[in-house]
């Protein structure tokens, strides 16, 4: 017996981890600076760590009350009903829930190229088809309604990413509204705001209450520093509320993740520090790296270095882990996550040495 034909399904390619690189390179993990996965360099909120410790002896229980409490807290934060908040194992989980709720076999989704691979992966898992709209490095991967609508052909779901991964460009709220206005009544416009805390643009969540064709994805992985716990959520139109119970994987958002997220929501100081550091670091990288960069509103910077694979490999030899963006269809670009001030300065210095030695990436 064999699994079904999965030849159209491409595996997700994550950034490499510290331990993995240290083993491969024979390096001390403590000497490595990991800037490949857009993680929070400050780690989780101390309050979240305390909550994990406090509730660790309860993991034999299903996360019913913690899930309910987190849903209520998020609904209060965004001024929506609890039925509109779909808590999930990471924002990826919410993408799957929306696929389950929206897609019939053969339905299409429209996704950005380059972009986050899981939009297409989830659609194909759920027997959907995938179309793309192109974002170009020639204009800094600028996002607007015209770009999306020129590729739109009645797809069931249209994915927007603001800030966009891997470029960091944003989709202004007026452009989101224009896309929702121009698409068909049965098209759901999904705005992925995984990096929303780092941007200086308005969230699209208020649109969810204005209309029934917009949903928004959010996560605790980035600004809240809970990537390892896999906890996220979506805010959906009120009319979609009752679908959650029919598509949600039971108890998929685990007890410790829900408890940590509840505590992290109250630690506004930790989030503010994380955002401040990211904004400082992305400006530092843009100013000091010896390569052209794309203006970013995320906790990362996309740089054009000429040969992403060579630069990423050589950078690892110097103890800096960055993301080779060849898997995004950008073989000339690397993505550099924002680190601490000290880590960012040191990483940029080592990257500049790498670029100089390779004769690549010098600013035009």
From Swiss-Prot:
Residues 17-33 have a biased composition (Basic and acidic residues). Keywords: Amino-acid biosynthesis, Aminotransferase, Histidine biosynthesis, Pyridoxal phosphate, Transferase. The keyword NAD does not apply. Its EC number is 2.6.1.9. Pathway: Amino-acid biosynthesis; L-histidine biosynthesis; L-histidine from 5-phospho-alpha-D-ribose 1-diphosphate: step 7/9. Residues 1-46 are annotated as: Disordered. GO terms for biological process: L-histidine biosynthetic process. GO terms for molecular function: histidinol-phosphate transaminase activity; pyridoxal phosphate binding. It comes from the Archaea. It catalyses: L-histidinol phosphate + 2-oxoglutarate = 3-(imidazol-4-yl)-2-oxopropyl phosphate + L-glutamate. Its cofactor is pyridoxal 5'-phosphate. It is an enzyme of class 2 (transferase). InterPro entries: Aminotrans_II_pyridoxalP_BS, Aminotransferase_I/II_large, HisP_aminotrans, HistidinolP_aminotransfase, PyrdxlP-dep_Trfase, PyrdxlP-dep_Trfase_major, PyrdxlP-dep_Trfase_small. The modification N6-(pyridoxal phosphate)lysine is found at residue 222. The keyword Metal-binding does not apply. Belongs to the class-II pyridoxal-phosphate-dependent aminotransferase family. Histidinol-phosphate aminotransferase subfamily. This is Histidinol-phosphate aminotransferase.
């Amino acid at each position: 017996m064999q699994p079904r034909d999965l030849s159209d399904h491409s595996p997700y390619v994550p950034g490499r981890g510290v331990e993995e690189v240290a083993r491969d390179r024979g390096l001390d993990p403590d000497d490595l600076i990991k800037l490949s996965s857009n993680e929070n360099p400050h780690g989780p909120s101390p309050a979240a760590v305390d909550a994990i410790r406090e509730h660790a002896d309860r993991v034999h229980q299903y996360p019913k009350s913690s899930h309910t409490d987190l849903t209520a807290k998020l609904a209060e934060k965004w001024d929506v009903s609890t039925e509109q908040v779909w808590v999930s194992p990471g924002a990826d989980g919410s993408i799957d829930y929306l696929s389950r709720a929206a897609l019939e076999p053969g339905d299409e989704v429209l996704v950005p190229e380059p972009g986050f691979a899981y939009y297409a992966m989830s659609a194909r898992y759920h027997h959907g088809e995938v179309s793309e709209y192109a974002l170009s490095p020639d204009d800094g991967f600028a996002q607007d309604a015209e770009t999306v609508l020129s590729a739109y052909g009645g797809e069931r779901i249209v994915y927007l990413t603001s800030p966009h991964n891997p470029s960091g460009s944003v989709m202004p709220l007026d452009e989101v509204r224009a896309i929702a206005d121009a698409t068909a009544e049965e098209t759901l416009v999904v705005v992925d705001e995984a990096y929303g805390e780092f941007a200086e643009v308005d969230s699209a969540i208020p649109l969810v209450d204005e209309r029934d064709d917009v949903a928004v994805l959010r996560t605790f992985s980035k600004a809240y520093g809970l990537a390892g716990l896999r906890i996220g959520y979506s805010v959906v139109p009120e009319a979609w509320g009752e679908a959650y119970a029919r598509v949600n994987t039971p108890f998929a958002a685990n007890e410790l993740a829900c408890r940590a997220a509840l505590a992290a929501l109250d630690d506004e100081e930790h989030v503010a520090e994380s955002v401040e550091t990211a904004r400082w670091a992305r400006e530092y990288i843009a100013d000091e790296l010896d390569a052209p960069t794309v203006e970013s509103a995320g906790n990362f910077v996309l740089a054009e270095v000429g040969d992403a694979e060579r630069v990423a490999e050589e950078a690892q030899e110097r103890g800096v882990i960055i993301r080779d963006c060849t898997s995004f269809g950008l073989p000339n670009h690397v993505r550099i996550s924002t680190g601490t001030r000290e880590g960012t300065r040191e990483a940029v210095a080592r990257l500049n040495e790498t670029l100089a030695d390779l004769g690549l990436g010098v600013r035009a």
